[in-house]
Amino acid sequence: MERVKVIDSIMGSGKTTYIIKMMNEAPKNEHFIFITPYLDEVTRIKRSCTNRKFYEPKIHSEEGETLYKLDSLHKHLADNNDIVTTHALFSMANETTKELIYSGNYTLILDETMEVVKKLNISKDDLDMLFQNEWIKNNNGTIIWNDEQERNLNREYKGEFQTLKHLAKSKNLILHNESVLFWQFPADIFAQFKQVYNLTYLFDAQIQKYYYDINGIEYELYAVVKDNDSYKLMQHSRQFDKAKKDVLRHKIKIYEGDLNKIGDDYYALSKNWFEKRSVLHKRLKNNILNYYQNILKSKSKGNLWTTFKSHKSKLSGKGYTKGFLACNIKATNEYSHKRSLVYSINRFVNPAIDDYFRSKGIIINEDNFALSEMIQWIWRSAIRNGQDINIYVPSSRMRKLLMDWLENQR
């Protein structure tokens, strides 16, 4: 496999348009898999690729047999069809998927980065129980399912950890510090493709960048640049974003006033702050209410806000509660009419994931990660359509990151 071509360009710069043109002009004997988090992008690819037909794997019946989505994906791969589907389905890839991709000579288009490392919610007690009952084995840090135990007992495991069983059989589970279990997307799948394109923005801030690093996956950075009526790829430079940021700087109106005092501390509005400074929850809620009702005088239908889901109820208030959008949501364009935003959160990498990468000698840049997550969230709003927005960012750290980015200092 050639190096992954990471097309790192700001939102709305033409990444998908460039790729659609590339696929339309490719010889018929080339085959593509387009993976996206957005359902409406699935529709766009199917409509826009007029010179080739893209198939979307779905649950359906064939000759009296129910084909689930992964089965459907495998059938399309076996038929050498061009395929468009979601991150969720692609994350289920197994050994059969890899073999079919390799033999089909496919090119992968990965729209946005995926969740490639995820901490599983399983207690150490449950983990110890699975080891003691010999359902799982530790193979140099990789957790594998013990098929021999099922044969010895003459029965198939049907307990509550069947999802874990499926992941372990795919050899995608990693044990960290003898107590934390991670699922990792199978890194060797990328080597099965003829070529891989990764469309994203601020790639250096993405967990997938660090995942590539620990798995020895080589990549090179490009940017999409407007070329008359078309687009072309060029070696990546941050300066390509400057013109877009100059426009955005005048369209994103960041609140600066006394309501920001609550977030002066570097760690204010972090997960730890919410758990330990409950006395300040009501003040933050009143600040949000004040911002919407008195400063903006905005209508409920135009309000969009976020915080940690576990603390949502403590900040919810009249006129904006229904406008909540989780801070890590990327796969939606349903909020593109929202123009009054509150970003009441201070993002840091999950400590367990941070510790896992540190154990591999990789240090995640927390500020880049936080900035990327915030920009992705803001981009769910009306700014994606070129409309002006107002935003209250109480955290001094997050606010400075946003301002520095708009000034092209990040």
Curated annotation (Swiss-Prot):
Q: Report the protein name in the record.
A: SPbeta prophage-derived uncharacterized protein YonV
User: What species was this sequence derived from?
Assistant: Bacillus subtilis (strain 168)
